[in-house]
């Protein structure tokens, strides 16, 4: 309860005050309709002239070929962030028809959903966060996509599966930690897109990629964020 939380905070303050001089103030935050605030601040995102990401309360975009409806809740992937935009734009230059796809760190599921709309027929999305997993399942249903299997887990969940295309919009540390697992899940013609890192991270990721038999297709950036598109050498 709020009362128990307040009492717990007071106990902590009292304990710390025994060790050093400490002053504190308490402010009650006015209750607000956070859903309304979120809706007021969530604007549709155009990835290019072929794709738009919107929320359920936006009007439909009948003039756009690929419309993706996302209810993000606590998950990452609305298209507003540079990394999501970078990966999605790059996806339009890849042939997805009848391909198998892995979306690592799937968040809202937006990348996997776009891959399905671009023609991929066998898709797996994996995220360690339970909120994200549940949200991705919900978003796939909203978009009438039934070809994606979402998994609550990490790279170990890949198992012995092999994919034509891997999307990993995560962060530098996880990419470096799990890249060997990703490469193991690639065939001789597979492609992989990494994002979620900065310019200074590129040498580390490229070095590890080349050690594992990958070669760079293209490197792109948006503001300070980077994207690497690689394939089997």
Q: Predicted regions: what is each one?
A:
Residues 1-62:
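N-terminal auxiliary segments of SAM/dcSAM-dependent transferases
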Residues 23-25, 52, 122, 147-149, ...:
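Conserved beta-strand segments of alpha/beta enzyme cores
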Residues 52, 69-71, 86, 193:
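Conserved beta-strand segments that form the floor/walls of ligand-binding pockets within enzyme
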Residues 59-64, 158-161:
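Short loop/helix-cap segments at secondary-structure boundaries that form the rim of catalytic
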Residues 128-232:
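S-adenosylmethionine
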């Amino acid at each position: 309860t709020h009362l128990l939380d307040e009492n717990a905070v007071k106990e902590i303050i009292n304990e710390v005050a025994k060790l050093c001089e400490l002053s504190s103030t308490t402010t009650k935050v006015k209750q607000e309709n956070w859903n309304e605030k979120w809706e007021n601040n969530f604007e549709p995102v155009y990835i290019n002239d072929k794709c738009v990401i919107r929320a359920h309360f936006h009007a439909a975009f009948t003039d756009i070929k690929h419309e993706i409806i996302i209810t993000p809740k606590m998950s990452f992937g609305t298209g507003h962030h540079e990394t999501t935009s970078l990966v999605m734009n790059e996806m339009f230059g890849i042939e997805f028809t009848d391909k198998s796809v892995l979306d690592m760190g799937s968040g809202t599921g937006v990348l996997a959903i776009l891959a399905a709309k671009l023609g991929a027929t066998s898709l797996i999305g994996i995220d360690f966060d339970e909120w994200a997993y549940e949200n991705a399942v919900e978003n796939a249903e909203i978009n009438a996509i039934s070809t994606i299997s979402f998994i609550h887990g990490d790279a170990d969940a890949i198992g012995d599966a092999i994919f034509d295309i891997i999307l990993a919009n995560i962060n530098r540390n996880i990419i470096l930690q799990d890249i060997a697992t990703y490469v193991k899940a690639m065939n001789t013609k597979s492609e992989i897109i990494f994002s979620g890192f900065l310019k200074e991270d590129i040498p580390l990721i490229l070095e590890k990629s080349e050690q594992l038999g990958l070669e760079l297709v293209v490197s792109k950036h948006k503001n300070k964020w980077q994207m690497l598109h690689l394939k089997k050498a």
